[in-house]
């Protein structure tokens, strides 16, 4: 007995402990159910209203307190509002916690209501209830409800996903168990066919009672629409509104209404993009989402793990975005690749001759030639076949070890004769000197594709005597420009090389309608709108001869993980999460609970069948399919790429075996094909995991013949994906079988495992065509998968660590932006900006005259202290003094601005208010004129204070957006440039974190400076009017402002950037980042107004010693 087994025998395994924890809840539900079942139909619905009322009342005191604080905010001084808002935020958190306790209290009754409703719909064709206003509204648009007099008649059949569906489901005990797990914010792992969709109805119904909204997140729009239609009537019966965001256009009123529904269905991408769009909005009317309350993520492993390397990006055009070198440099790369192919073939034929020699030295030379051929083109089919022969791969690996000794000291001897070197495991391509010579050719500049040592050149320039500062600056600019041009050229060559040597059409991507579209390696589906990053996608477009898309700039970005982390409560469902439980806990603190099946699984999972070559393997697959079809069993064949699915299709057509193909090119009929995949003798070829969420139902004849047969044509890198394929068979206790066919030429085996298995096969004397099937082999393959999973987890975690840096910045910026947009907290933010600006002017200037100039430029004020005071007084006291004067000036100027605007506003509103909704007010800061749109009625009622608020809002939004966009670009450049730190034995992430803090500080300072400078100088341009002008003013037609503009999203592109590409995994080969001017790092830390006081009281500095200074 192992140590883990020993511990399990004492404490029980995790599954048992989870069951023990949840079982009392299930017992409570069962105890509450008989009372609920006694209620008539109206009583059942009334019970729901009773629960809603109970939950609302549970936090009524707290809500009243928060409302009272909000109502009195206008009477609080600007400087003190921050504390009031902090109190409001604290109460809002308390309300959420109170609601959670109330939900736990009503859970048994709420779950019983859902179960009883499901039972009544399954047992009755019609349910008659007293009609409510909600019923009458529904009856106008839904065909499953009709009104007769004062009665509403609900039918038990409706359209879901294009099919007429009769409700026939009632919750099992294990589904109640799953419902509790989801409500508790955990992941429920349930086997295929166990009714995950029905399980979700329990926690969705319960949490929707709060009125704060529940989001049900799915992986594709078909499932989102189908599930909202399928489960919707069960919720609507109890007066809960249901909608699906994927039915409506982004930024539309319909999309906003969908978010206001009690229950909102949608795809993960659309939820994420709506969040980004909301944070680019220019009016509160543009916002669609409300608070992130509770989300249930269907197929949670796919969203939180498979998509983990894929940030959502909204990008827009950049100046000169059409300029690119890909088409221009493509012929050079094609020449390079052709030359390498000739070289690789030559080395391979040399190796074949020399390895069979009796001379030991010649054998060594043969294995070196083989190693060179492998480094030249590792995917060469002839090479892969030769490596599968007895003893060949082991010999090549020994040769590799010789050259890898002492930190790759001799590796250049092996690779110098090549034009470029490919490392499959690192996903990298490196150009050699020989390759550079080939593409440079007869060029006048032999260093055309060689990056100069910019640091050394700049150092030489600094030490060069006899040059004026101006001449040095000119030379420096020329050096940096030359470096940037060469850097772009080298980068383009590298990306084109990757496109030609590491990315294959119909495997990693497909070309449809003149566009390169990425095929998701996990699902086999086309990832619409997703692009490889860093120019790789453009390189593939150039390779395929399609239009190379223009370069874009990121305007807003977030990873799905960081989006879903914003929810107050998050849970998920999947058939396979146990293998990734560690990652889900590490990153999201989500616990995986395995839900037992309702009936025992009867599927037979066989050991892997291993062959030496792919040819033998596919031949065996076809023979296996033929036998299963003859036995009358349906067969689902899982493949890892479009190319393999098309090849198997051709082989089956030659054998005259009828079949359906489901891959990235033929995905339109997915639901139909998968639904028919259970018919007797049906063969369905599908790329991995296609059809998730659609059950394959079997007829009695098929069950008698042995059920659905799953054939995997290759082991995937992830055990989870293999488990998902196996899980298609054996639903609800049905019979079935699964088996994987593997060859030593498969990518997983070739890269991670085949040397050990190959040596076993060599020792046992297996010949070509023979198959090995043994538990030891299956275990060895699983070990290889674990190795890859660990590597992929490392990559995902690393990328998340990079995004976490940006996420902290994004949270700060988007919070400030939302304050400006909504207007409620804008005054508080401006006060803090003025304080920061005052403190910075005192802190950053050692000279009195410089300090005076700084205050004049940014705060438009004279220094409120003498030179002597500046030298002798404490800095914090000077800052406080400056701040008091600045705030007084700011209040005086804003009051003056309102006074000047008010007569005009009053006149227009009283004479022409019925004609105009908004008015444009011209305001200038002395440098630029701003036309500020303001609501006429609000301006009139507030005596033009609304004009000031609109001015502040417009300026703050403009400055934040421009600064954040620039910061994103700099962070992007920084991320690439820090990779070079690994060559200096430094951690690039650490350097990134340190440098990004400096960038962020610079951005915040820039936002503060620009905002304060414009607001402090803002005034309505007026001149003393003549009598004629006064008379004309009385007759002037007022210029009407257009209705407040909606954000036009059409110029932006939404995309999912694929971070699972070589650029993100391998260290960047050159520093592409332009030199950025850095502020000196200051050792001493200044205490901000809102920082904790250094005295240790726990109060904010401004309320403690900051006030006493």
UniProtKB/Swiss-Prot annotation:
It holds the Pfam family SEC-C. Part of the Sec protein translocase complex. Interacts with the SecYEG preprotein conducting channel. Has a central role in coupling the hydrolysis of ATP to the transfer of proteins into and across the cell membrane, serving as an ATP-driven molecular motor driving the stepwise translocation of polypeptide chains across the membrane. ATP binds at residues 175, 193-197, 695. Its cofactor is Zn(2+). This is Protein translocase subunit SecA. Zn(2+) binds at residues 1093, 1095, 1104-1105. Residues 1038-1109 are annotated as: Disordered. Disulfide bonds: none annotated. Residues 1099-1109 have a biased composition (Basic residues). CDD domains: DEXDc_SecA (cd17928), SF2_C_secA (cd18803). One of its GO terms (molecular function) is metal ion binding. GO terms for biological process: intracellular protein transmembrane transport; protein import; protein targeting; protein transport by the Sec complex. Belongs to the SecA family. Residues 1045-1059, 1071-1088 have a biased composition (Basic and acidic residues). May bind 1 zinc ion per subunit. NCBIfam families: PRK12901.1. Keywords: ATP-binding, Cell inner membrane, Cell membrane, Cytoplasm, Membrane, Metal-binding, Nucleotide-binding, Protein transport, Translocase, Translocation, Transport, Zinc. GO terms for cellular component: cell envelope Sec protein transport complex; cytosol; plasma membrane. Monomer and homodimer. Part of the essential Sec protein translocation apparatus which comprises SecA, SecYEG and auxiliary proteins SecDF. Other proteins may also be involved. SUPFAM superfamilies: Helical scaffold and wing domains of SecA (SSF81886), P-loop containing nucleoside triphosphate hydrolases (SSF52540), Pre-protein crosslinking domain of SecA (SSF81767). It catalyses: ATP + H2O + cellular proteinSide 1 = ADP + phosphate + cellular proteinSide 2. It is found in: Cell inner membrane; Cytoplasm. Transmembrane segments: none annotated. InterPro entries: Helicase_ATP-bd, Helicase_C-like, P-loop_NTPase, SEC_C_motif, SecA, SecA_CS, SecA_DEAD, SecA_motor_DEAD.
